[in-house]
């Protein structure tokens, strides 16, 4: 019967173990420190007051008529929801990405797309901005977008990383389209001067 006596000691050891357990509780406190938020790029905000309207009075009248076709307000308030903005832009011959539409809208929350309203005077500068960018592109926007990947801050990005960006983000390109754009752009280290690359794209 003597060999059974050590068993309570095992229980004692188990009982003692939890006393050491609270020590690791301090570990979770370190988690908030690793917040990558500051590294996200800051896009220039759309400022309607800086947009110069270059449309003719006749064009503006046509745009207004099209705008009013999307007016779903009960009393005909001559307004559309934020969520309809992209539809109206496309009805007027523009082809903005959803990201571009959200940008000119001030990046509203999902629930605001159906609740917030705008009148034609608010919409017109957005149309002017999208229309102008469709033809000329925005060199600064492209450069700013690629600068995020410039880890060394020396004006270059890795060719492999740029290929990934072109193939997966925004207006996705096929592998062949990416290779045509990248042809002759990489240096001996496999890096690309992104400002020169943007000029190359916009000139082609």
Curated annotation (Swiss-Prot):
Residues 1-47 are annotated as: Disordered. Residues 1-14, 37-47 have a biased composition (Basic and acidic residues). It comes from the Eukaryota. The modification Phosphoserine is found at residue 188. N-terminus is methylated by METTL11A/NTM1. PROSITE patterns: EF_HAND_2. GO terms for biological process: cardiac muscle contraction; regulation of striated muscle contraction; regulation of the force of heart contraction; ventricular cardiac muscle tissue morphogenesis. The modification Phosphothreonine is found at residues 97, 136, 138. One of its GO terms (cellular component) is A band. Residues 58-95, 137-172, 172-204 form the EF-hand domain. Keywords: Methylation, Motor protein, Muscle protein, Myosin, Phosphoprotein, Repeat. Regulatory light chain of myosin. Does not bind calcium. Myosin is a hexamer of 2 heavy chains and 4 light chains. This is Myosin light chain 3. It comes from Mus musculus (Mouse). The gene is Myl3.
